[in-house]
Amino acid sequence: MQGAFTDNTNNTGSEKETNVVIVRYGELALKSPGVRNWYEKILMKNIAAMLDSKNIPYSLMRREWGRIFIETTDPRAAGAAADVFGVVSTSSALITKPELDSAAETCAFLGKKIIQEGESFAIRARRSGNHSFSSADIGRACGDAVWNMLESEGKHPKVNLGSPDREIFVEMRQNLAYVYLETVKGVGGLPLGTQGKMVVLMSGGLDSPVAAWLMMKRGVMIIPVYCNTSPYAENAAKERAYDCIRQLQTWASGHQFTTYEIPHGPNLRSFIEMCDRKNTCLLCKRMMYREAYEIMKKEGASGIITGSSLGQVASQTAANMHAEIYQLAIPIYHPLIAFDKSEIIDIARKIGTYDISTRSAGSCTAVPERPEVKANYDLIVLEEKRLDIENMVSEALKAAKVLKL
């Protein structure tokens, strides 16, 4: 069932309680009113697309100040919404009237279901809007209701505000109150699509998918580019890269990637045959940047993303990374520049690309035995003068494939 959007609710809570997912967001709330309104609308569309992609039904999606509410009975909804960029946390909750008695009754109902003999509990209450009672009043009323319910069940209630076995949360707003038991941590960041588009050089290894995901988390829609280095790489390398792109697509419901495959083998052959072998990797990367830059302009994007991490491999020295962009007026983003390998692996596991990226796909046979690690910038430019760089870029792009994976 497709849901509907509304900006507020006039529901007074007079109906039977229904299940709802509370969606919280972070830095969106710091934006100016106009920008915030725009971000929230995009976030709601992205959440709706994520729910639809997982066949999770909802009857209504609405927003109030600082919150988005999804009315649904599907237990998967909170987890799905938490995986949408821009969402800080979610909670599956019960709706009730914004009154002490109603909130207390709902807390007692949930407490009866979850609190076992010998377990301690605490009520965590907060409120917004105009009410004749304080958050402390909510806590006392709801705590008393749970205590009395437990005693009526023959249990021995215990309150522990510091480290309880069970917690019941109450969020009292102007028109409705919400009672819930847990919070699902979201991915955070900004809604996908709010920060334009960027090209990402996608190799299929551990690093580039993580770099792409981190920029998606900051609201950037990615355009994956795979430079096919065949015959210097196995076909398994291409399949691995494509599978990583497909996995990243699951984080971008409602946003279809446009993927480019560029034949890069002929250019590599030229570098090997006509230039100093130690510079092959540097020349290769500079060519990839040029090719990606042309796609960036074609797609109306505003930057190029790489998976480079300073010092991680011999070729990723500060000098080499400078040489890779020397005299190239191209905006390059390195989101992993200061990450340890262990941190990159942790994120890869989280986003679902680790098992793909660690599949055996062979190594690039064009890599020299002793690659340059401290490049001479001007020498690299002189190396390129031996080649018809402009024509090499043009021919590669003419043969590029445009894919919807």
Swiss-Prot record:
Family annotation (InterPro entries): Rossmann-like_a/b/a_fold (IPR014729), ThiI_AANH (IPR020536), ThiI_fer (IPR054173), ThiI_N (IPR049961), THUMP_dom (IPR004114), THUMP_ThiI (IPR049962), tRNA_STrfase (IPR003720), tRNA_sulfurtransferase_ThiI (IPR050102)
Gene Ontology terms, MF aspect: ATP binding; CCA tRNA nucleotidyltransferase activity; tRNA binding; tRNA-uracil-4 sulfurtransferase activity
One protein family per Pfam: ThiI_fer
Chain residues that bind ATP: L201, M202, K285, G307, Q316
GO CC entries: cytosol
Class of the enzyme per the UniProt entry, highest EC level: transferase
Residue span(s) of domain THUMP: 75-183
Subcellular location: Cytoplasm
Signal peptide: none
Pathway: Cofactor biosynthesis; thiamine diphosphate biosynthesis
Protein EC: 2.8.1.4
Superkingdom to which the source organism belongs: Archaea
Any one Gene Ontology BP term: tRNA 4-thiouridine biosynthesis
Catalyses which reaction(s): [ThiI sulfur-carrier protein]-S-sulfanyl-L-cysteine + a uridine in tRNA + 2 reduced [2Fe-2S]-[ferredoxin] + ATP + H(+) = [ThiI sulfur-carrier protein]-L-cysteine + a 4-thiouridine in tRNA + 2 oxidized [2Fe-2S]-[ferredoxin] + AMP + diphosphate; [ThiS sulfur-carrier protein]-C-terminal Gly-Gly-AMP + S-sulfanyl-L-cysteinyl-[cysteine desulfurase] + AH2 = [ThiS sulfur-carrier protein]-C-terminal-Gly-aminoethanethioate + L-cysteinyl-[cysteine desulfurase] + A + AMP + 2 H(+)
Gene3D superfamilies: 3.30.2130.30, HUPs (3.40.50.620)
Keyword annotations: ATP-binding, Cytoplasm, Nucleotide-binding, RNA-binding, Thiamine biosynthesis, Transferase, tRNA-binding
Family: Belongs to the ThiI family.
Record-linked HAMAP family: ThiI
Function: Catalyzes the ATP-dependent transfer of a sulfur to tRNA to produce 4-thiouridine in position 8 of tRNAs, which functions as a near-UV photosensor. Also catalyzes the transfer of sulfur to the sulfur carrier protein ThiS, forming ThiS-thiocarboxylate. This is a step in the synthesis of thiazole, in the thiamine biosynthesis pathway. The sulfur is donated as persulfide by IscS.
Protein name per UniProt: Probable tRNA sulfurtransferase
Taxonomic placement: Archaea, Methanobacteriati, Methanobacteriota, Stenosarchaea group, Methanomicrobia
Gene from which this protein is expressed: thiI
